[in-house]
Amino acid sequence: GDKRILIDSGMHPKAESKDALPQFDRILDEPLDAAILSHAHLDHSGSLPVIQRHYPEMPVFMSEATDALAQALLHNSVNVMTSKREELGINEYPFFTHREIHKVNRQWHPRRNGKKFELHETGGASCTFYDAGHIMGAVSPLFEFSGKTIMYTGDVHFEDQSIIKGANLPSEKIDVLILECTRGGASRDPEYTRWSEAEKLALRMEECLEARGSVMIPLFAMGRTQETIMMLHELQRARKLRNSSFLIGGLSIKMTKIYDRFSNRIRRNHQGLNLMRVKGLLSTPRSRGELPKLEQGNVYTLSSGMMTEKTMSNRLAQQFIANPRNLVACVGYADPDSPMARLIGSERGEEVLLDSKKEPVKRQCSVQSFDFSGH
């Protein structure tokens, strides 16, 4: 047909300044009829207010949960970009303001999974959302144009996680498939199950806690934090893991509260279970920048997942990794250039650079990786 639909509008997670933006100049000469946001992660949503500035009347469709999560994440992105403007002298930051997010949100139109909707008021193109199983609110849109069907999976995951159920995609024939392949080159033990991996994690945590150590699990604030808290709760209920205090903070708290708002409104495991009321879950100090106290026997479930500089997990790690009784458990993706990857690749007793503006820290703790991919 003659409709032009934008699918996702992210920011490059490793680039800075304008290099982080998509090549918008390649599409700005033509109109856009609508946009689809498959899920809230910043590599899919991070530049949406920028493109909406060029197309202020363009409707943007997403799930209701993605609407809530993406708003919170974009507001946090403004804060991060503002800090980087001051620290790194990147004058283009922030790409948008808090006020602009509120303004462009008026063109956001949440839609329910499984319900076909028109992408434009003149008709000619429709879309149906299907559950993608990646994080809360993630969808795989199925487009229909002129009797042809196109499916974009977005980030997709087919196994049940602790909270989010596996993808629920249509079985009928489609004409074109646009498929993500994050793990396209990764093999996995055929005996692997998510629960067996959880039991391995619990065993290592028990060894650490029995030896009077503490555990740090660096986590992405949205998605991985909530899945991990639920998994630890499941392990405790199954008597695989002792009752401990789980500490979360900052953006992780905000995202967990949004997950709780949808606990009865989405297709998920543990319907209605409120994560903020899970036994042992504690909020870290409220004052900005204050680190939680390092106490024996605690489990520090802190962002960011890659131990990015200036984040709580990175700053606490500078004290944490010096204790040989402690354990750092990596449960998500670690970019090869990240502090988390440097820690994983180090040997006990080796110095690890966690912050480019500080001295390296000698790693004495245990470090182990576990596979809980959302792809």
Question: What are the functions of these language-model segments?
Answer:
Residues E351-H375:
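Generic long, charged, amphipathic alpha-helical segments
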Residues H41, R194-A198, G280-L281, M306-K310, ...:
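A conditional alpha-helix N-cap/helix-loop micro-motif detector
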Residues I344-G349:
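Substrate-recognition/cap regions that form aromatic- and gly/pro-loop-enriched pockets
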Residues L32-A35, S187-R188, Q296-S304, C365-F370:
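Short, basic, glycine/proline-bearing loop/turn elements
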Residues W108-P110, I178, V328-C330, Q364-S369:
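Conserved beta-strand scaffold positions in the cores of enzyme catalytic domains, especially
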Residues L201-R342, L354-K357:
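Hard-cation-handling environments
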Residues G1-I36, H41, S45, V50-E227, ...:
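His/Asp/Glu-rich metal-coordinating catalytic cores
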Residues I27-D29, N168-S171, P292-L294, F320-I321, ...:
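Solvent-exposed alpha-helices and their adjacent loops that cap or buttress functional pockets
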